[in-house]
A protein has these predicted regions:
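Extreme N-terminal starter segment of soluble prokaryotic enzymes
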Residues: 1-6
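N-terminal strand-loop element at the rim of the active site
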Residues: 7-15, 19, 27-82
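Histidine-centered beta-alpha loop that forms part of the nucleotide-sugar donor binding/catalytic region
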Residues: 10, 66, 111-112, 133-135
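Conserved donor sugar-nucleotide recognition element shared by glycan-biosynthetic enzymes
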Residues: 17, 21, 84, 88-91
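Short, well-ordered alpha-helical microsegments
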Residues: 47-48, 114-118
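Short His-centered aromatic/hydrophobic patch
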Residues: 88-91, 109-115, 133
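Glycine-rich phosphate-binding loop signature in dinucleotide/nucleotide-binding domains
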Residues: 98-105
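Active-site proximal beta-strand in glycosyltransferases
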Residues: 106-108, 122-135
Length: 135
């Protein structure tokens, strides 16, 4: 049975983490295609422009169907923190349900890691949590 890997990388700006996340997910599929089932969580539409590329590389996408990406403030320290808070509260229940129902073996968090950290600490999941820091 394949192990499930979920990627959580909600990014506001096209920073290096986008490329890092894509490369990591593609590598997991390429070198572990018989061992791993790779899924990227599209929390608020931030991965929409990469959907064709992800499908071409056999990476599944789970959409939370919040198309907020265009509307969230991205520039400035305080404005981006407001966006992070919105993402945290809007995605809390969907992410909790997702982990509870689909039970990934590995959960790799790249950005806005406070949300998955909170969920993993509040609940008893068998999921291995990997905090990935890039850049």
């Amino acid at each position: 049975m394949k192990k499930k890997i979920f990627y959580w990388s909600p990014c506001l700006n096209p920073v290096g983490t986008v490329k890092s996340t894509l490369n990591s997910a593609i590598s997991a599929m390429k070198f572990g295609k018989d061992k791993y089932d790779v899924t990227l969580i599209n929390a608020f539409g931030e991965w929409d422009e990469h959907s064709d590329f992800l499908k071409k590389n056999n990476i599944k996408i789970i959409n939370f169907n919040y198309k907020l990406y265009k509307y969230l403030p991205k520039k400035g320290f305080f404005q981006s923190r407001i966006s992070y808070l919105i993402i945290y509260f809007v995605c809390f229940i969907p992410l909790l349900r997702l982990i509870k129902t689909l039970k990934p073996d590995y959960f790799i968090a790249h950005l806005i890691t406070s949300l998955p950290l909170t969920i993993m600490n509040l609940s008893k999941f068998n999921t291995k949590f990997i905090l990935r820091i890039s850049g």
